[in-house]
Amino acid sequence: MEKKGSNKTENSANFNIPVKIAVLIDGGFFIKRYNSLFNKEKSKTAEEVADDIYTLAHSHVGKENYLYRIFFYDCIPFEKRVHNPISKKCIVFEKTPEAIFRNQIFEFLKQKRKVALRLGYLKDSGHWLIRPSKVKELLSKNIVIDDLSEDDVYYDLRQKSIDMKIGVDIA
C-alpha cells in the first residue's frame, strides 16, 4: 500500500535504464545561435564548429545513455547568381562566405561517427523583398523608395524538404 502524499506509483517510469538517444539539430538555427553565443567575431573555423556540434550533441546524451545518432538538418547553399535591385551588383550565392562555410561544416560533419547529414534545398521564389522595418518606414512616409540601400532588400528563399526528412527520421 502506498503512503499518502507519496509521488511514487506502480506505473512510474524507471529512468535508470540506459537508452539510445537520437539528437536532432536544426542546422540553420543552431549556427545562428552558436555564432551569437560562441563565435561573435566569426573567428572559428568550420572544423571547430563541426567539432563543437559533435561535442554539444554528445553532452546532451548523458553518461548513463548511449548515442544512437546525431541528425543534422540544413539546406544546401543556394547556387544562383542574382542582381540586387538597388545596387545592381551581381550576387553569386555559392561564393558567399556563408555558403562556403556551410559546405565546409557539412564536409567535416560527414567525417564524424554517428552523424547523419540531412540536407534539403532552398526554393527560389524569383523575387526580392523589402525588409519589414523598411516597409513600415515607407508606409509611414518617413522614407521614400530612393532612400533604400542594398541591405534593405533580400532575396526570398524558402527551405524545402527538411520537415519531411525530420518526419521520416522520427517515424
Report residues per predicted region.
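Active-site glycine-rich loop that binds ribose-phosphate moieties when present
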Residues: K160-D169
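Domain-level signal for Mg2+-assisted phosphodiester chemistry and nucleotide/NA-binding surfaces
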Residues: E2-L139, E150-Y155, I162
